[in-house]
């Protein structure tokens, strides 16, 4: 679960990570009141779970409460990369001498934790990695020994932070590691971590991702879930325990097994290159033991995505037999009625494939097109999405 910045800063405060005071609001009047309470210039910051807020006009400096009110009115309702701003963080502005970068994350490729630190903060870390790789330190972290003050200082040194701030930076880095472990996070990122003119270290912006698999031992994390900010299709999928991630393409994808679904995304993206650049619209894995009802629920989710122009169902029958999948498709189409108005390309193979294909053939639904192979199915789905 990705957190809003204000939620990340709540965790910073909980774990004694130094940051600037502030509060969240959903009105311009609230922004003015918070600025008046702080009594100093403030930053008015859009709360959206995406980058590029500053370039989109979602982060503004306000010298007075009235300035905060004006900026808040302009930012609320702003569309930033498809995310509509509904909340604002109003926090005390800080004098900045230098900007740094620090993060902890899971390094899945090497099956370890990783600290990343750079003296080049305040810019996209991908840009630093591409243009100044020598300025970005990547330090593996032992899960058993963790990050004590000495290790934290070493991370700061490797990130080329100035000698005069190493001790203060080490304390903050150590606290961020404690947060990372205690909250079962998969990412804790501060960009920028700043040095003030009097050599204080402050976390001015924060990004935290929590591991949903640890929810059973983190009951407090439920309070961070914002259903208003979650895509309604993802909420609908979650209600049916479907593994669904919305993407930005036009071809809906359903498969059984994460590996097959990932392969299907690649094949559809490749096919889309010759059909107007269409792309996959989602990741949806119905799992290894899915029933007809689960298949129907998956189709219900995808067919309600307005971006979807066609659907590719790619199933290799194993535990989930092809006849169960076929019955699920027929059930979903009957249930949706006139709401089902997008072509479905279906490729079935494996357990009970003949029965599955026969069920679809006998149903003779005008929207269903059967494909023999994954490649031909992906090509047909991409072609239909481009019409």
UniProtKB/Swiss-Prot annotation:
Task: Quote one Gene Ontology molecular function term.
Answer: magnesium ion binding
Protein name per the record: Succinate--CoA ligase [ADP-forming] subunit beta
Q: Could you name the Gene Ontology cellular component terms for this entry? A: cytosol; succinate-CoA ligase complex
Binding of substrate occurs at 256, 318-320
What is its pathway?
Carbohydrate metabolism; tricarboxylic acid cycle; succinate from succinyl-CoA (ligase route): step 1/1
Keyword RNA-binding belongs to the record: no
Which family, according to the similarity comment? Belongs to the succinate/malate CoA ligase beta subunit family.
Q: Which residues lie in coiled coils?
A: none
Q: Give the UniProt keywords, A-Z.
A: ATP-binding, Ligase, Magnesium, Metal-binding, Nucleotide-binding, Tricarboxylic acid cycle
Which InterPro entries does the record cross-reference, listed alphabetically? ATP-grasp, ATP-grasp_succ-CoA_synth-type, ATP_grasp_subdomain_1, Succ-CoA_synthase_bsu_CS, SUCC_ACL_C, Succ_CoA_ligase-like_bsu, Succinyl-CoA_synth-like
Which annotated residues bind ATP?
Answer: 45, 52-54, 94, 99
Q: Which PROSITE patterns match?
A: ATP_GRASP (PS50975), SUCCINYL_COA_LIG_3 (PS01217)
Entry's EC annotation: 6.2.1.5
Q: Which cofactor does it need?
A: Mg(2+)
Cofactor stoichiometry and binding remark: Binds 1 Mg(2+) ion per subunit.
* A Pfam match: ATP-grasp_2
Residues annotated as domain ATP-grasp: 9-236
Q: Which GO terms describe its biological process?
A: succinyl-CoA metabolic process; tricarboxylic acid cycle
Species: Mycobacterium avium (strain 104)
Function of the protein:
Succinyl-CoA synthetase functions in the citric acid cycle (TCA), coupling the hydrolysis of succinyl-CoA to the synthesis of either ATP or GTP and thus represents the only step of substrate-level phosphorylation in the TCA. The beta subunit provides nucleotide specificity of the enzyme and binds the substrate succinate, while the binding sites for coenzyme A and phosphate are found in the alpha subunit.
Gene symbol? sucC
Q: Does the keyword Nucleotide-binding apply?
A: yes
Reaction(s) catalysed (UniProt annotation): succinate + ATP + CoA = succinyl-CoA + ADP + phosphate; GTP + succinate + CoA = succinyl-CoA + GDP + phosphate
Q: What is its quaternary makeup?
A: Heterotetramer of two alpha and two beta subunits.
Binding of Mg(2+) occurs at 191, 205
């Amino acid at each position: 679960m990705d957190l809003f910045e204000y939620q990340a800063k709540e965790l910073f405060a909980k774990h004694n990570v130094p940051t600037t005071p502030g509060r969240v609001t959903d009105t311009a009047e609230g922004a003015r009141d918070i600025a008046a309470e702080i009594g100093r210039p403030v930053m008015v910051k859009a709360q959206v779970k995406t980058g590029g807020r500053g370039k989109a006009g979602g982060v503004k400096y306000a010298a007075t409460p009235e300035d905060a009110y004006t900026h808040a009115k302009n930012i609320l309702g702003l569309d930033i990369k498809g995310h509509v701003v509904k909340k604002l963080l109003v926090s005390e502005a800080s004098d900045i001498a230098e900007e740094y970068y620090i993060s902890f994350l899971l390094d899945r490729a090497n099956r370890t934790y990783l600290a990343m630190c750079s003296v080049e903060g305040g810019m996209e870390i991908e840009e630093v990695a591409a243009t100044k790789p020598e300025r970005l330190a990547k330090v593996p972290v032992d899960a058993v020994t963790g990050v004590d003050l000495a290790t934290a200082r070493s991370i700061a040194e490797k990130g080329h932070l100035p000698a005069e701030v190493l001790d203060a930076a080490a304390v903050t880095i150590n606290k961020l590691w404690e947060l990372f472990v205690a909250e079962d996070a998969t990412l804790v990122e501060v960009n920028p971590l700043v040095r003030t003119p009097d050599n204080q270290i402050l976390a001015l912006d924060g990004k935290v991702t929590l591991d949903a698999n640890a929810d059973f031992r983190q009951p407090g994390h439920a309070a961070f879930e914002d259903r208003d900010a979650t895509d309604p299709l993802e909420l609908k999928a979650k209600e049916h325990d479907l593994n669904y991630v919305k993407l930005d393409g036009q071809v809906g994808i359903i498969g059984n097994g994460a590996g097959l679904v990932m392969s299907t995304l690649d094949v559809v993206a490749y096919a889309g290159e010759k059909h107007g650049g269409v792309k996959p619209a989602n990741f949806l894995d119905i799992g290894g033991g899915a029933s007809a009802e689960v298949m129907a629920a998956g189709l219900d989710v995808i067919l309600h995505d307005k971006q979807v122009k066609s659907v590719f169902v790619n199933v290799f029958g194993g535990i989930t037999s092809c006849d169960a999948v076929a019955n699920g498709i027929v059930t979903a189409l009957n249930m949706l009625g006139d709401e089902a108005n997008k072509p479905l390309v279906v490729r079935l193979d494996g357990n009970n494939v003949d029965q599955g294909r026969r069920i679809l053939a006998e149903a003779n639904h005008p929207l269903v097109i059967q494909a023999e192979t994954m490649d031909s199915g992906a090509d047909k789905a991409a072609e239909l999405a481009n019409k």
